[in-house]
Regions:
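The serine-hydrolase catalytic nucleophile loop
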Residues: 38-53, 67
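Primarily recognizes the serine-hydrolase "nucleophile elbow" in alpha/beta-hydrolase
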Residues: 91-169, 207-208
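Conserved alpha/beta-hydrolase
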Residues: 56-72
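Conserved alpha/beta-hydrolase "acid-adjacent" motif
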Residues: 242-248
């Protein structure tokens, strides 16, 4: 059952969809996972549906919502600050606590795609209500993320444009506006051709403040990931990822305590991995949440080898495709 809901976060009314598993509420409250979209994502993206189906089948509710300024949520659509999104996500956890169908002691967070994955880490690092975390293709350091998308000359041009914009905003009140896909990010060739996000691309703000880049510069999930332990963290990366370099996931993994796991998808690319590894990765995500969203007085902690790193690979099909 899916219920369209609204809740408030720092003065903005946010739109969400609460998906409940069969029998939720009739046999007691159920665990729930809150999901905020990835970079330039929306709550109703087709991309997320297989994840939700797996969690619902496991008896776990899902609350997916639009960040402020996106989709059906209120708020300024021109200024993208990941920390505003983190605040929205924490408000989503509070909303889940208000629902009688939900066990407020068994809340998890799931995020995918750049700031989506990074936000999941940031939320859990700041909010102990998140008892289990799955972060897919996350960023660890926003400044490094934007820097590595650019040739050095392009990076220096961005820094110069930001300096000029700061002066203009302070002296005139006017802000430079850019495309979030071209002026904040630099799209890879794969991003220009993929259809993975085609159902939401046309509903994303066309222009945002260039100053959004400065907010991303200040965004460092790696600074809080160590606070998650002893709650459970699973990170998912793509080897040789041209959009979100996998060493960001490695940096988060190294800094985190335990329980923790790093899953690395090989022989694929950032966007292709979603479909190529779906039937492998989705069960791992469901199993992680089932294992670690434990209620009552029983809590499961693990100590073991330093590396719980799993490399996933697909054997070539017949004919070599």
């Amino acid at each position: 059952m899916a219920i369209e809901v609204r809740f408030h976060s720092r003065g903005a009314a946010l739109a969400g969809t609460l998906k409940l598993p069969d029998g939720a509420g009739s046999s007691g409250p159920v665990p729930a996972v809150a999901q905020g979209p990835g970079w330039l994502g929306l709550r109703d993206a087709r991309l997320y549906e297989p994840y939700h189906e797996g969690l619902l089948a496991a008896g776990i509710a899902v609350l997916v919502f639009d960040y402020r300024g996106f989709g059906d949520s209120e708020g300024d659509a021109t200024y993208l600050d990941p920390m505003d999104q983190v605040a929205d996500w924490r408000s989503a956890l509070t909303y889940l606590e208000s629902r009688p169908e939900i066990d407020s002691d068994r809340l998890g967070v799931f995020g995918s795609g750049g700031t989506g994955g990074g936000n999941a880490v940031m939320v859990a690092g700041l909010d102990e209500r998140a008892k289990a975390v799955v972060s897919q293709v996350p960023i660890a350091d926003g400044r490094d993320w934007l820097h590595r998308m650019r040739r050095e000359s392009e990076w220096l041009e961005l820094l110069a444009a930001l300096r000029e914009d700061r002066l203009r905003r302070v002296t005139t009140g006017e802000a430079a506006m850019v495309s979030p896909r071209e002026g904040i990010m630099v799209p890879t060739p794969e991003r220009r051709t993929t259809t993975v996000k085609s159902d939401v691309d046309g509903r994303i703000p066309a222009l945002v403040q260039l100053a959004s880049a400065e907010a991303i510069f200040a965004y460092r999930p790696v600074d809080v990931v160590d606070r998650i332990s002893p709650r459970a963290l699973m990170l998912i990366a793509v080897e040789n990822d041209a959009t979100t370099p996998e060493d960001h996931a490695y940096a988060l993994y190294r800094r985190a305590g335990g329980p923790k796991r790093l899953v690395v998808q090989t022989g694929t690319t950032h966007y292709a991995a979603y479909a190529q590894y779906r039937d492998v990765v989705n069960p791992l995500i469901v199993e992680w949440f089932r294992r670690h969203l434990v209620s009552g007085e029983v809590h499961v902690h693990e100590a073991g080898a330093e590396a719980d790193i799993r490399y996933l690979s697909r054997p070539p099909t017949q004919g070599g495709d």
